[in-house]
Amino acid sequence: MESILMIFAKLPEAYAPFDPIVDVLPVIPVLFLLLAFVWQAAVSFR
C-alpha cells in the first residue's frame, strides 16, 4: 500500500516540468480568501 502512495506522491517524469506549478496550487484558495477581504475593504464592508 505504501509503495502505491509513493508512486502517486511523486509526479510521473512526463509531468516533471509542471512540478513548480503543482507546488503553488494549494496556495490558490488562500489567495481567493485574501481577495475577498480586499474586495470587501474596497466596498467598505457593505
Swiss-Prot record:
InterPro entries linked to this entry: PSII_PsbK, PSII_PsbK_sf
Prodomain positions: 1-9
Transmembrane segments: 25-45
Primary location recorded for the protein, binned into one broad class: plastid
Keywords recorded for this protein, A-Z: Chloroplast, Membrane, Photosynthesis, Photosystem II, Plastid, Reaction center, Thylakoid, Transmembrane, Transmembrane helix
Membrane topology annotation: Single-pass membrane protein
GO biological process entries: photosynthesis
Stored Pfam families: PsbK
Subcellular location: Plastid, Chloroplast thylakoid membrane
GO cellular component terms given for this protein: chloroplast thylakoid membrane; photosystem II reaction center
Top-rank taxon: Eukaryota
Function: One of the components of the core complex of photosystem II (PSII). PSII is a light-driven water:plastoquinone oxidoreductase that uses light energy to abstract electrons from H(2)O, generating O(2) and a proton gradient subsequently used for ATP formation. It consists of a core antenna complex that captures photons, and an electron transfer chain that converts photonic excitation into a charge separation.
NCBIfam families referenced in this protein's UniProt entry, alphabetically: PRK02553.1
Assembly mode: PSII is composed of 1 copy each of membrane proteins PsbA, PsbB, PsbC, PsbD, PsbE, PsbF, PsbH, PsbI, PsbJ, PsbK, PsbL, PsbM, PsbT, PsbX, PsbY, PsbZ, Psb30/Ycf12, at least 3 peripheral proteins of the oxygen-evolving complex and a large number of cofactors. It forms dimeric complexes.
Family annotation (HAMAP family): PSII_PsbK (MF_00441)
Family label: Belongs to the PsbK family.
Designated name of the protein: Photosystem II reaction center protein K
Species in which this protein is naturally found: Stigeoclonium helveticum (Green alga)
Taxonomic lineage: Eukaryota, Viridiplantae, Chlorophyta, core chlorophytes, Chlorophyceae
